């Protein structure tokens, strides 16, 4: 028998091995190709970027220069703090500027004092309680000025009023009724009506704030 032919068959050659060719050819990564196209585009090196949509300008902002309301309803109605004393809006003997109050004070001074005390104390002291204490001190000691002068001091501290024409205790001791009338007018001239009580003044202030907020704005300017 002859020796078998040792010549390798073309199929046994690595150059023609289909398995070898299958292993040598690397799979194409589509993601890498896509990234390469984005980094190195074929349009002359210009990187394609998504079209930017221009932002639509927002509505203009209006600033009301007439008034600013930053306080909630029911705020304290305490008077402003004054660095320098201000003057009384009426004199001690200008009782006839409010004839009705002068008549009530002359006949029922405890009523006027109770109304004044309730507003000055911002409701902490009721009109009835202050009036009863006034009448009790007047009946027992006949010197209600020792009690009423303390509220005159509170009123002056609240609005920065001067101690005039005399110290508080002297003013109430010699001019009790005139002092009560002056204090009543002072509160009324500053926007606080003692006749409606503290709660009435708070409600009045709330109504005023609501009307101002509902009113059409004036003096506006538009911010670009």
Swiss-Prot record:
InterPro entries: PLAC_motif_containing. The chain crosses the membrane at residues 131-151. It is a single-pass membrane protein. GO terms for cellular component: membrane. It is found in: Membrane. It holds the Pfam family PLAC8. Coiled coil: none annotated. Its main location: membrane. Keywords: Membrane, Transmembrane, Transmembrane helix. Belongs to the cornifelin family. NCBIfam families: A_thal_Cys_rich. May be involved in heavy metals transport. This is Protein PLANT CADMIUM RESISTANCE 6. It comes from Arabidopsis thaliana.
